[in-house]
Amino acid sequence: MEELYELPEGNNCQVNQVLYNLLRRGVEWDLLPWCRSNKTAVMAYSPLEQGILLENKKLRNIAQKTGISEAQLSIAWTLRNEDVISIPKAASLEHVEQNIKAWEIILPNEILRELDEAFNPPTNKEALNIL
C-alpha cells in the first residue's frame, strides 16, 4: 500500500481487500492501522476461512454463549470496526439472510476478549496471507 500511495494518483485507492478472519489476523499488526491512518477501508474476504471456522470448537462454544451462529459471530467480529467491510460467501438465500443479521450484531467486550484468547492477535509483523 505504501508503494501504491507513492505513485501518482495512488492515494486515490479507496479500499484494500485482504484475507482477514479470526484465524488470519496478521493485518492487525501494521496494515490495518496504516489503512486507518490513510482513510482506506479494508475489505475482509473469506471471513469464515472457507468454512473452516464453522467447525471450530472454540468458536462454537462462544457462539452458543451469545445465541448466534458461528458464521454470524465470525462475520460480526470482522465488522466490529467501522472501517472493515466483510464479504462472506453465501450458497443459499438462508445464508444471505443469516449473514445480513451479522451486520446488526454488536459484540460485547467480554466476547471480544474471549475471541482474542481463543484466536490470538498477532504479536509481530506477519507476511500477508492469501487464498
What annotation goes with each model-predicted range?
Residues M1-P122, A127-L131:
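Beta/alpha (TIM)-barrel catalytic core signal, keyed to glycine-rich beta->alpha loops juxtaposed to Asp/Glu
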